[in-house]
Amino acid sequence: MNAHVKSAGVAVKVIKKLTPITVSESHLMELTATIGEELAEARDRQAAQYVQGTLEPEVKEPPQAVAVASDGGRVLTRAEEAGRGVHDPAWKESKVACLETLNSQPSEVDPHPELPGCFAEEDVVGKLVREIKSIRKEGDQASNDGDDEGDRISKEAQSLLNSLVLPAESGDDDPSDHELAEVREPKTKTNRKKRRKNKDWRPKRRVRTSVCSMCSSDEFGPKVAAEASRRRFFEAARRAFLGDGLPWNWTLQARWFPDFEPILDFVHPTTYVYEASRVVAGSDAKAWPLCVRWLQACWQGQVSLVLEELRDWQASHPSPPDEKLADTDGRTIVKKALTYLSHNASRMDYPRYRRLGLPVTSSMVESLIKEINYRVKGSEKSWNRPSGCESILQVRNAVLCEDADRLSDYILSRPGSAYYRPSTGKRASEEITAA
């Protein structure tokens, strides 16, 4: 129960209401920590078996199409064994990987060559860019002062991203949902059929599992690869690895998933294209048409055309070698866009990904992080560093995996005794008396 609801306090109330069991918040958190530590140990043993080549798959048949997406979250931590209260608060990055089997069909032609309607709406794209920039700015501020404002803005941006992503990639088949994903049209019967037909090409999620940890990206790689191997992802005919441009994502992909198609989440280059177009166009009236043209080029796999125009502008607006430019300077904005797009150009062949029936956004992992944050983040909520963070991540992750009821199955099958606490070796009756 403590993995499903917002806090241990809520879990205690639910348990009391539904069962004759009485348990304190502190005792429930002790049990959660114990189970979380054991789940982390089991995950690490699985990773070690994969590295040693002894890990056996647990599914009968390999899937046809799969996607792995990784990203980083943020968890507020505190010093461990420092007494009551929050001591030495610090935001730390959690690593999260989402592994999905997909229901999709390859196609000989690009099933959706035109830019989705939402990316042709200036107010929508402008709001998206502002929200993503707010996440970065407020995230840095929160890291310095321990404020949770960054999480509030992140949730707002996530809500917008969810309205922009292709709905079938989130497992949503309702043609009335996420209307921003298509050009706005009257809700006639004909247009409903048209929207449904346009969505048929998008890959649909079948089964999702996930891996999360507070470890480094180097340590995270084998944990994700082990989960993928257990589900026979490496044997799939079509394989995708999605990320948002963070360097560690592509290092992990190159080391542990070299045969997977690396795909840059389409939403993130949109922010660089939007800001650079406002600089290059020279006027507000010309900026938006240029942005749409560049976004269309990226959507059609022609990022080289965008890079060429950016380089031409940069050549005609040189920067003095000894001058430090402000972040708001147009030359700085164009340079950042050039760097980002050139570094990721090889991961932006979106027409080919769509022909293969693969997703082109990393919304799957962004939505997963939001589900994890429901339990892990909140006002005045901090976790012991590092054990408390790792434990709560594991129990929350166990209830979010869709291949089985992982948490219940583990608790019901774990070795142990009703009379002894494994961590202390004391008799349960002695602990009750001492308490």
Annotate each predicted stretch with a short phrase.
Residues 1-435:
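Catalytic center-proximal scaffold of phosphoryl-transfer enzymes
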